[in-house]
Amino acid sequence: MTQLSEPVPVSLAARRSLWQRVARVWPYFSGSRAGWALAIGATIVASATEPFVPALLKPLLDRGFQRDSFNLWLVPLALMLLFTVRGLSGFLAQFALAKVTNDGLLKLRGAMFDKLLSARLTLFADQSSSAIANTVVYEVFNGSSMLINAIMKLARDVLTLLALIGYLVYLNWKLMLVVALLFPAVAFVIQVLSKRLYRLTKESQTATDDLAYVVEENVMAHRDVRLHGAQAGQASRFNHLSNSLRRLSMKSTAAYAGMSAITQVLAAMALSAVISIALLQSAENTTTVGGFVAFVTAMLLLIAPVKSLSDAATPVTRGLAALERGLDLMNLTPDESGGSFVKARAHGDIEFADVSVIYKADAAAALDQFSLSIKAGETLAIVGASGSGKTTLVNLLPRFVEMSSGNIYLDGQDLRAWNLASLRAQFAFVSQHVVMLNNSIAVNVALGQPVDRARVTECLAAANLSGLLAELPGGIDTILGHNAMQLSGGQRQRLAIARALYKNAPILVLDEATSALDTESELAVQEAIKRLTASRTSLVIAHRLSTVQHADRIIMMEAGRMIESGTHAELLARNGAYAHLYRLGFRNT
């Protein structure tokens, strides 16, 4: 199976430092300077309020209960003001953070989708559609939310720690030395367990892709699975992958929980030491009750940010791992490359010169030193057994497949010299595998071009779809739904023919385009195709005699080579491979 999670080895990604990994995603989230400024400013204010809680306790305990020595009413008023400022700052920081996250997510998703539209087509052969969709839609959303929130929480906790530590040093620098011993140990725990979390996160991404792919396969093949009674096998496959994902999730939870538990134990050890030393100091009258309570309170307030810092490794690690999948999709997938030659409308002369295509190093050539010249306006029929190279041949023309060697020329210009957009504008494709967008009939027919309603209706009529339009209340504005599945196979294929008619390209490729049509529909569509091919270069792959017998020329292919060429009558008279195929039933298939 294919999947998306393999572009960068985990070991290579793990060798990058935390700051190197953050630097990779920073350009997408750095645009909203006002948002960052507001979030950081509000975070600083919220963090600075933390030491005021124990600071209010000290005078209250030392002097507050002595008559006329301290105004007790100042304490509740100060607390109200303190928590009002704190709450408002938290709200502003969260709102600004949401803006930063969503702006960055919009930018990152846009860049990823642009990459999907411009990437080499090997991307879609190497990776499953579920893995790509999971990365673009879910991974970057979860990753950006986790990472940005974790970074700001990290900043808030660090600032809170600094504020509290400053207050602790002011209160009792000797006790603070004991607390300081906690930080190296916590840092060591975070460093060790973060590496494990990163590895487990990458493995979980792969397992999630595998599971999503099984679901995707069973949705697409639901009829075949039921027809062949394969439910038990597919359920076993799904359960095996689900259990693998569950085990990885439990390992991640154990690492996360272990990090939190160890940090709390270290904090408890430090607190116990502080209390012991404070008791010794109180015997020497160097520590007041208020000072001791304020110190312990401030130290207890330290536990939350320290624990949070230990927990921050999990969302930061997971967020970075998720976002790096999107970055790897963009950075490690090369774009399609084209030349600069542009022509508004090609004449239609095509030449293949010693073209070979080898998909895998250890596999036989799909095309083997293939040479052929096609004149402008000629209708060429291509026949041959399955796997003979017919579809590979026509997919070379718009560069959906790249040749391994040789040259292909359109109007005397090497295909690689053509601008890709200009090159592909010269071709209209109709294949047996029809893909329609979840949009209106009009938009699907005019795909990539402005919608001319009269022209759309004309093309639909030429493709024998007038009857269907009359049955639809919305006419050409009817939404087709997922791949137009409410239409029959023949109707979808005729819709693809209408799309080709609308494009009005100088070169037409029909890849078994009438294979799903009934006899009545085929006769109507054949007439439309005959009109369509009258002034165009046409390449027709078909298994039906009616599709090829009127072609100007027929070529017979076998194992990536052309073994015969001529008209239908000439090839029958030659009594070779084509005549043999014809006698085996080609005329009836």
Swiss-Prot record:
Reaction catalysed by this enzyme: ATP + H2O + lipid A-core oligosaccharideSide 1 = ADP + phosphate + lipid A-core oligosaccharideSide 2
Membrane topology per record: Multi-pass membrane protein
Any one GO molecular function term: ATP binding
Location in the cell: Cell inner membrane
Membrane-spanning intervals of the chain: 37-57, 72-92, 151-171, 173-193, 260-280, 286-306
Enzyme class: translocase
EC numbers for this chain: 7.5.2.6
Cross-referenced NCBIfam families: MsbA_lipidA (TIGR02203)
Family (UniProt): Belongs to the ABC transporter superfamily. Lipid exporter (TC 3.A.1.106) family.
Oligomeric and partner information: Homodimer.
Domain comment in the entry: In MsbA the ATP-binding domain (NBD) and the transmembrane domain (TMD) are fused.
Purpose: Involved in lipopolysaccharide (LPS) biosynthesis. Translocates lipid A-core from the inner to the outer leaflet of the inner membrane. Transmembrane domains (TMD) form a pore in the inner membrane and the ATP-binding domain (NBD) is responsible for energy generation.
Protein name listed in UniProt: ATP-dependent lipid A-core flippase
Originating organism: Polaromonas sp. (strain JS666 / ATCC BAA-500)
